[in-house]
Amino acid sequence: MTNIQKLEASGYTRFSAPAKLNLFLKVINKRKDGYHNIQSVFQLIDLHDDIFIKLREKDKQINIKNSSLLIKPENDLTFKAAQLMLIDRQLGADIVINKNIPIGAGLGGGSSNAATVIMAINKLGKINMSKIDLIKHGLRLGADIPFFINGKNAWVEGIGELLNDIKITNSTYVVIVPNLSINTKTIFS
C-alpha cells in the first residue's frame, strides 16, 4: 500500500493545489500599505502539490506534516489558512502536504496550498461560505490566494485581488527551476 493509499484509508481526503505562471508582470506603483499595484496574467499549470486533510470534532488542534523541511510552521501559509477557517469552530485538522511545486520559484505554491486548505475546510467542515467570502478570507493571508480560490486563468490587477477570468489558448510551457530560491517579499522590496 502506498503512502497515498494509507492516508486515504485512514480518513484523509486528497486535494490538488495547482501551480501558476505569471505570463507577464507589470508593477504599477507601491501602495501606502506596502503592497504593490500590479497588472498580470496568471495561468494555472498542471504541476501541483497534494494536500491531504482530515478534520476532527471537538479538538481545535491543527497538525501539519510537510514533505519540505524548508518551511517553518510559523511561516506556513497553510497553517495560517487552517487557523483562519477553524478559529471559531470546534474542529481541528490533520494536514499532510506532499510538495511537488518548488519553493521560492515564483509558482505560487504556498498561496495555492493556503487557498486549497481554505476551500477544503469549507467543504469538509460544511461551513458553506460563498466563493466571494472565501476570496475575502484568503486575501487576508496573501495577494495570490484569491486567484487560486477563483480557480481560473485570469487578468489580475490591484494587489492580485481584482480578477477577470480569461481564456488562454492551449499552450505548452517548460518550467526550469534553477537551484535558487527567491522570496516574493524580497522581489517587491
For each feature predicted by the language model, list its residue ranges.
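ATP-dependent small-molecule kinase catalytic core of the GHMP/sugar-kinase superfamily
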Residues: 2-16, 22-40, 127-189
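N-terminal beta-alpha supersecondary unit
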Residues: 7-91
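Residue-level signature for short turns and capping positions that connect secondary-structure elements
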Residues: 28, 58, 69, 100-102, ...
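Short clusters of hydrophobic/aromatic residues that line enzyme substrate/ligand-binding pockets
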Residues: 38, 64, 70-71, 103, ...
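Active-site catalytic microenvironments for nucleophilic, acid-base chemistry
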Residues: 84, 88, 120-124, 140
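Short pre-catalytic strand/loop immediately N-terminal to key active-site residues, enriched for Gly-Thr
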Residues: 93-106
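DPxDG-like acidic metal-binding loop motif
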Residues: 105-135, 147
